[in-house]
Amino acid sequence: MISDSLLDSLATAISKKTQLPEFPAGISVADAYPCLPILTQKVSGSSAGIKAGITNVDLQKLFGLEEALIGLLYQNGEIRSGSNLPYSPHRRIECEMAVTFDAHGNPIAVGPAVEFVSLDFARPEDMSPGNVTLCNLGADQFICGDMRNWDSFDFDALSALEIVATRDGEIVLTTSPMDSLGGPKSAHAWCMAKANELGYSLPQGGILLAGTNGSALPGEPGEYKIHFGHLGSIQFTIEGA
């Protein structure tokens, strides 16, 4: 069902940030999952960790899914706060929480993150759960903020925290860090269990991006600052089209 040539074409498109190839019909999520380590190896040589996707229950129903999905992060995908990114009409911005973990999946630290997701399908009919999964859920680049020790972290305080995203000083999103999978603690437990179920190897010092809080934002040009309350902020600029 999923040929080596398709994976090669996908890896090339993802690496070069060009349009994805056409997909054969009928690829399921179950078909896609075993191919993700192979694709990730082709794109970046190794995985930087795991990402959660389609964590919104309404979206899951829309796609006919019974649970969220996971993908793998590319080793070359992490960038620094303050980075400049070229404009891409296919980029979406996701406000997330990140968890670092050891090779056994045990949590090390937790903090804010922003993920940049990109899916440029050649045909509308190619946008299916299986094909999205096969593309590592659109994994591209991400920024992690200041990370805090997991064991001493006050998870109860997250319930009162607001994530506020601004573009050129105007608020474009207000959301909660508990919105995706009930927060980073439960997200970590679910994602590690899913990765183990799928037989994925976990990198030492790996990163979990725990899913989109609120709506994904269109990657319009501008200066962005994502405020995570007492956890700090992440900023970046998307250059003009």
Language model: regions and residue ranges:
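Conserved metal-binding segment of the jelly-roll/cupin
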Residues: 202-215, 219
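Active-site proximal loops enriched in glycine and acidic residues that flank catalytic Cys/His/Asp
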Residues: 211-212, 228, 238-240
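A short tyrosine-centered beta-strand micro-motif
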Residues: 222-226
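Catalytic-core "active-site belt" of small-molecule-metabolizing enzymes
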Residues: 2-183, 188-189, 197, 217, ...
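Short strand-turn-strand beta-turns centered on an Asx-Gly dipeptide
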Residues: 167-169, 210, 229
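Short, solvent-exposed cationic patches
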Residues: 193-202
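Short, structured beta-strand/loop micro-motifs enriched in basic residues and often containing a Trp
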Residues: 187-193, 206-208
